[in-house]
Structure formats: C-alpha cells, structure tokens
C-alpha cells in the first residue's frame, strides 16, 4: 500500500529480541507489520486501543513499506519463529505469500468474523481488511461530462492531461490490455496501447503524492488510481470524481494474515478478527474512502454513495489472475521502463 503516507520505521527490533526471554510479555503482545501514516493511526485508534488493549493485549506496530515487509515475510518463512504476528499487504503480495506456504490457514473457527466477509472477497489464508477499485479519477471542473469508457483515457482531446502513477504500472498495463482487446490473462495487447499513450504525451508521475500535486495544479485532468484516493483528495479540496467505466475496473484489496511461524499466533488471529469489526471498518471508510469488507459495517448514506460501488459496478470488476501477473510482472515492468517510459 505505497499509496498511503509513510512514517519513519518504528523500531520494534529491541522489543522482539526480548520476547523469548519474557513469556508473559510474549503472551500479552502482538506485533503487526503495517503501513504508517493515516493507515497506522487508524489501526492504532480503531483496533489497537479500542479492541486489543481492553483484552490485555499490547500492540507493537512494525512500520515499513510493503516491499521490505513482504521481503521479511518471505525470508523468515523457513525460520522456527518469525518477527511478525500479523502481516498487512496488498492482495498480489498476499497471493505470493500464500503460494509459498508462509501463511496460517483461516476459517470461521479461528477468525469468527470471517463469516461476515462478503463472499467475493473471501480467501483461505488472509482477511480482506478494506477495498476499493483502481478506476478513472478525473477533474470535475475540467471534464464536466463524466467519462464512460476506458477508451476516453486515449481521447486526443486530453493530450498531455492524462497522468499515470509509475508505481501502478501493473494496473495501468491492465487498463491498456483491456483497451486493446486483451484480458486478465492476456496483456500482450497492452504494448500497443501504452505506446499510444506515449504518443499522446501521457505523463508518468513518480508517486501518489505527485499525482495529487499534478491534479491540484491542473497539470493533469485524469488518471487511473483507487477511487478511495480520489475521495481523499476531494476531501482536501481538489474537485475530483470517479467512474467505473463500462468495461470495468481493477479491484484493489488490502489484506492481513498471520504467518505460520508467528510467535503469538493466537493474538494474531484475534487481531484479524478485530480488524473486521464494524467500527474499525467504518473508521477507515470515513477517513480514507475504502469500502468495508463485511456485511454488518453500515455506512452513512451520503458516505456510502460517495465511496461504495453498486452491484452492477461490482459485476464489472475485473478478476485479476495473480498467477499470470506473477509470471509476467518482470516482463511488464521491463516494457514499461524501457519502451513506454524510454
């Protein structure tokens, strides 16, 4: 979730080295590998302090970006004990961890609130904590008629006004593939559409923050990014809207799991259950615009209208084939960097 603002790494190494020596401390703690910024603050307020502390469980946040967290999870999977009890990662990274056998299997017996998770988001080794969709976000002052199709991203009248996040190269490539007649298991047509973007002077922006700045200055009028991010920027005063195009959108799910070799597996499972509590879910919705993943988290009607998706829109969500993405990601990145960005 590199879209979230990061804070400096919170050093829990000293604490974790003490855990094996102090059995009570070990049994009353849970170490959560997570993002910082607003995400970490909301976890601290809505899960750590509101739910875990009353149970007598101290939460230590191990804050980092997703790449070092994923690397740590993979590197430690053969160890007798890992350094995290809960790992928070995006769906693609969690797929890889599951395939490598790094995660504890989950069900309603060890995480009771999994029974409230929407069926289309359920998985065997992770919980879906929050979700949104990577879709078209646009400046409502400059584009007064909402886009209807992903092909609008290639409309010559928006020459030089389409911005693309460098970090979201996979999502951008997926949109290009669909626009070119491909599918979630055939990204080959993306190459032609990417080069068309280049000829239309599409701007590649280095970070999520750079996309926000480009919207604010009106350097760009349109991008592909999480609808939740558009909501947050709109709340900050930038006139933005989002649409789920008639061809669909790329869902993005942020998940949490318990490593198989977690020191405090029981507390880790309790933490996953707490993340699915309605109050914790609605707090993320109000602050960050991400949609709850459980059926009993009820949003304010106005907020629901702004951030949620209709059943018809959900039906149009693409179904990413993570095995395909894992197989071809290096090739996609190479084309993105060498040919498209050039």
Q: Model-predicted segments: where are they?
A:
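Mature extracytoplasmic/periplasmic domains
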Residues: 25, 178, 259-319
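Early extracytoplasmic/lumenal segment of secretory-pathway proteins
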Residues: 26-91
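Extracellular/periplasmic bilobal clamshell ligand-binding domains
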Residues: 302-342
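A bilobed periplasmic-binding-protein/Venus flytrap-type ligand-binding module shared by bacterial periplasmic
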Residues: 135-142, 177-180, 252-265, 283
């Amino acid at each position: 979730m590199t879209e979230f603002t990061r804070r400096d790494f919170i050093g829990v190494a000293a604490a974790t080295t003490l855990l094996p020596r102090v059995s009570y401390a070990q049994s009353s703690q849970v170490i959560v590998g997570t993002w910082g910024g607003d995400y970490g603050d909301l976890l601290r307020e809505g899960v750590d302090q509101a739910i875990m502390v009353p149970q007598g469980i101290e939460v230590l946040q191990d804050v980092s970006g997703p790449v070092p967290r994923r690397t740590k999870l993979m590197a430690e999977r053969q160890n007798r004990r890992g350094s995290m009890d809960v790992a928070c990662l995006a769906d693609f990274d969690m797929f890889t961890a599951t395939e490598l056998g790094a995660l504890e299997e989950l069900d309603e017996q060890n995480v009771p609130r999994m029974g409230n998770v929407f069926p289309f988001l359920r998985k065997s080794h992770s919980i879906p904590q929050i979700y949104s969709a990577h879709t078209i976000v646009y400046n409502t002052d400059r584009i007064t008629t909402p886009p209807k199709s992903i092909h609008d991203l290639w409309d010559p009248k928006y020459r030089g006004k389409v911005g693309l996040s460098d970090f979201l190269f996979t999502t951008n490539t997926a949109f290009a593939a669909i626009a070119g007649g491909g599918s979630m298991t055939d990204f080959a047509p993306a190459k032609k559409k990417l080069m068309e973007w280049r000829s239309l002077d599409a701007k590649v922006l280095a970070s999520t923050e750079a996309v926000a700045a480009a919207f604010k200055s009106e350097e760009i009028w349109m991008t592909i990014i999480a609808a939740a991010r558009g909501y947050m920027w709109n709340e900050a005063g930038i006139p933005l809207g989002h649409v789920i195009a008639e061809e669909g959108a790329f869902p993005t799910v942020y998940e949490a799991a318990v490593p198989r070799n977690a020191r405090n597996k029981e507390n880790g499972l309790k933490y996953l259950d707490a993340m699915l509590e309605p109050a914790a879910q609605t707090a993320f919705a109000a602050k960050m615009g991400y949609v709850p993943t459980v059926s009993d988290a009820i949003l304010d009607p106005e907020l629901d209208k702004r951030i949620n998706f209709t059943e018809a829109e959900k039906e149009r969500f693409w179904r990413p084939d993570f095995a395909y993405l894992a197989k071809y990601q290096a090739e996609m990145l190479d084309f993105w960097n060498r040919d498209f960005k050039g």
